[in-house]
Amino acid sequence: MQVTFFRCGGVALGTAMHHFVIDGRSAFHFIQTWASIARGDASAIVPPSLDRTPLRARSPPTVLFDHSREYRLTAAAASPAPAVASGAKSPEYASAILHVTGAQAAALRARAAGGAPRVSTFRALVSHVWRCACSARALPDDAQSRLYTMVDMRARLAPPLPDAYFGNAVVRTSASARVGDLLAAANGLGFGARRLRAATAQGDGYARSVVDHLETAEMARGGGLPGTDLRVISWMGMPSHDADFGWGELALLAPALMYYAGFVYLMSCPGKAGDVAVAVALEPDCMARFKELFFEEMAAAM
């Protein structure tokens, strides 16, 4: 961690945490607890649940789903795929943080639903980002695009984990679509939203299968994405702006870096109910067009 004090009186606090140890919800729990201690408010501290046994692998491990896309095997385990060169740098990217108002998010939800049951802000907004990225990248209609995301399994396990479970309780999942189908005017936002709903509707059986897969598979180090794909991380609904170290409310909370092109974060905005900040990294020659499409399509939905 690093703390930087500015002459203007502002303070920047940076942290680095390993995803093998904790997920986003646990990371914000840690920061909230740290802030409570710093300002001397012990009453606000919620003790963490440190029991990891609910997420033990089964004996014997029973893998019921194909997790090979979401959890890549090492070159040795996935032969004959070529190994990634050690120390290889990720491709260059441009990044931006785009602001979506509560009214704009509501309009996207309505357009994605199209008269069907309610669509969540996450699914509507991610479908919008997915379509804009495919268009900005000028992908051909017959290309396959895959969108990776994560699901918090705390409430979906049987029995559910405690709310204060401290560890990594998210699993990776993904949705794929033919670009032509994703962008077809007749399909609209609802097509991608339905694909996302199917991908994120996983329950206890899927989570147990992931744990057993990780118990037996030799995993590869992280890397970039193909130019057709996206990886979306959502911090919406998390207590990301509740950390008061005694300096007052946060002015900004954001990822310090975006890793590689195709990475997207969704974040709630402090003090603005329903507003969402979208942090996105794309190939430099695609970013300007992505921004145009992002706001043009959103205006058309209003």
Give the role of each language-model region.
Residues M1-D229, W235-G237:
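Soluble acyl-CoA-dependent acyltransferase catalytic core bearing the H(X)4D motif
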